[in-house]
């Protein structure tokens, strides 16, 4: 099921892959630019801006007033380590939460199970493998706190 809020603009080229028992909720006054792909249960808040070609997997929650740069990936898929014959074992989806007012820079990747705190900034090109506290700037591969921001 697809639920779209008031005054929300979604480019025609955005792809939604929703199953029979999944819901994508997009809040009011949100913009999603072309080329994005959104799969499974996803909640996107109010006043969110998602730039072009973002890839979002199931079990993602994006808070209000979040900005997401182009080519960002929110990847909830992860695998158990399997036996020698096939190391990528059973798949699961660990949720990602993006806190209100945060900003994820271009070409960043956020991996399964991560929480990005409210008001945090993820610098462009970062790979986020661990939780990010509120009101910090993280950067790098893997992303690390480089600056505390004023609240």
Question: What is the meaning of each model-derived region?
Answer:
Residues 122, 140:
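Conserved G/P- and acidic residue-centered "switch" motifs that form tight phosphate/ATP-binding loops
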Residues 2, 9-112, 141-142, 149-150:
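Flexible, glycine/small-residue-enriched loop-and-beta-strand segment within the central core
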Residues 126, 142-144:
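A short, acidic, flexible beta-alpha connecting loop/helix-capping segment that sits on the rim
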Residues 67, 120-121:
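Short alpha-helix at the nucleotide-sugar/activated-sugar donor binding site of glycosyltransferases
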Residues 134-136, 144:
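Glycine-centered loop/turn positions within well-structured domains
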Residues 58, 106-120, 126-130:
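Beta-rich strand-turn-strand
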């Amino acid at each position: 099921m697809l639920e779209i809020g008031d005054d929300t603009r979604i480019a025609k080229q955005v792809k939604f892959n929703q199953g029979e028992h999944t819901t994508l909720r997009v809040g009011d006054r949100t913009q999603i630019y072309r080329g994005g792909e959104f799969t499974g249960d996803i909640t996107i808040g109010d006043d969110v801006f998602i730039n072009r070609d973002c890839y979002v997997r199931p079990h993602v929650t994006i808070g209000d007033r979040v900005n997401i740069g182009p080519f960002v990936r929110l990847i909830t898929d992860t695998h158990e380590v399997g036996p020698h014959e096939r190391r990528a074992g059973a798949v699961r989806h660990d949720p990602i939460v993006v806190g209100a007012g945060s900003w994820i820079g271009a070409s960043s990747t956020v991996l399964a199970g991560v929480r990005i705190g409210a008001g945090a900034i993820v610098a462009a090109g970062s790979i986020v493998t661990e939780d990010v506290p509120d009101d910090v700037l993280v950067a790098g591969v893997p992303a690390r706190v480089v600056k505390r921001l004023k609240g």
